[in-house]
């Protein structure tokens, strides 16, 4: 099998949520899958990455996480993902996966694709630099519209409220455990890692969700544990990412400075006192009276007679 994922950056083997979930799951069960870093989503049946290409046979490429987990269970490797879960634990895993998809995933989409400052500073620049022109324009527009459709018009406050609650729920479930179902990783751990790792590692000018995640030390520890055990970066990847760090720091700093400048300008504009309301009312009344009299004279409602004085 070949697993095609987006390239690595920001201390991660890939910055894409779904790519991280596929990759983490394959590594947790020591699957002999061949990982291919790619920036060619058009080769996938749905035009997105990740994609699992099964080299032997004529099987269609897989782009669905649950189908990929099923494939891993049947591959015959020594470590079988989710093999030790009871029926109740499997049901809980499914319920938790659904809960995260509806409460945490929208916030991740909003953070990277709907927040204009984050999108213009990080997301758009990263994908545009990895895709060739003019395909990058088409892909970014398509991906952004898809994200907005999935958000369904929810306002920022509602999205963040659901996400904060989801993070607190995750933190409570993890507790002091190494993984979410004890000391052995499951597909739920891969799923959660894919959601949390980009939020924790990718620098963003609007970082409200990052701040909330950082306030949950056990979730931060979980991300670091999975990264160090299952997804360590090669020396070449570390060097390449290090060379880009200053550029990203500069972009983030400039975006934050522009944000503060815009906020200061807005506050200054709001501080300018409005015209006195009494004066406006008086001027409006006088103007209305003048117009009314002029209209009445013009239509003949008021007649003005002029008498000439006869000289004796």
From Swiss-Prot:
GO process terms (BP): mitochondrion organization; protein transport
Subcellular location: Mitochondrion outer membrane
Function: Involved in transport of proteins into the mitochondrion. Essential for embryonic development.
Subunit annotation: Associates with the mitochondrial contact site and cristae organizing system (MICOS) complex (also known as MINOS or MitOS complex).
Keywords: Membrane, Mitochondrion, Mitochondrion outer membrane, Protein transport, Transmembrane, Transmembrane helix, Transport
Source organism superkingdom: Eukaryota
The keyword Protein transport appears for this protein: yes
Transmembrane regions: 282-302
Any matching Pfam family: GST_C_6
InterPro entries documented for this protein: Glutathione-S-Trfase_C-like, Glutathione-S-Trfase_C_sf, Metaxin1/3, Metaxin_GST, Mito_Protein_Transport_Metaxin, Sam37/metaxin_N
GO CC, alphabetical: cytoplasm; SAM complex
Record-stated family: Belongs to the metaxin family.
Main subcellular location of this protein, as a coarse class: mitochondrion
Protein name: Metaxin-1 homolog
């Amino acid at each position: 099998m070949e697993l095609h994922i987006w390239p690595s950056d920001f201390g991660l083997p890939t910055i894409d949520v779904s790519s991280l979930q596929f990759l983490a799951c394959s590594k947790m069960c020591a699957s002999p899958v061949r990982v291919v870093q790619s920036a060619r989503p058009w080769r996938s049946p749905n035009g997105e990455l990740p994609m699992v290409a099964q080299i032997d046979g004529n099987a269609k490429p897989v782009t669905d996480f649950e189908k990929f987990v099923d494939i891993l269970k049947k591959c015959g490797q020594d470590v079988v993902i989710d093999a030790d879960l009871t029926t109740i634990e499997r049901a809980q895993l499914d319920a938790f996966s659904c809960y995260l998809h509806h409460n945490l995933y929208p916030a991740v989409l909003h953070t990277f694709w709907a927040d204009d400052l984050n999108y213009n500073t990080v997301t758009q620049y990263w994908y545009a630099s990895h895709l060739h022109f003019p395909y990058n324009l088409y892909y970014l527009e398509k991906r952004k519209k898809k994200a907005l459709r999935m958000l369904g018009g929810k306002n920022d406050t509602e999205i963040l409220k659901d996400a904060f609650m989801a993070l607190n729920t995750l933190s409570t479930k993890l507790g002091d455990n190494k993984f979410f179902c004890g000391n052995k990783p499951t597909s739920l751990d891969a799923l959660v890692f894919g959601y949390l790792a980009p939020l924790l590692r990718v620098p963003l000018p609007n970082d409200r969700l990052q701040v909330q995640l950082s306030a949950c030390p056990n979730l931060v520890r979980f991300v670091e544990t999975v990264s160090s055990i299952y997804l360590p970066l090669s020396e070449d990847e570390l060097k390449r990412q290090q060379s880009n760090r200053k550029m990203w720091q500069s972009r983030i700093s400039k975006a934050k400075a522009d944000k503060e400048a815009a906020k200061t300008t807005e506050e200054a504009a709001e501080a300018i006192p409005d015209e006195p309301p009494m004066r406006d009312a008086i001027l409006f009344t006088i103007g209305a009276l003048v117009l009314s009299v002029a209209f009445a004279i013009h239509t003949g409602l008021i007649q003005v007679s002029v008498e000439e004085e006869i000289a004796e």
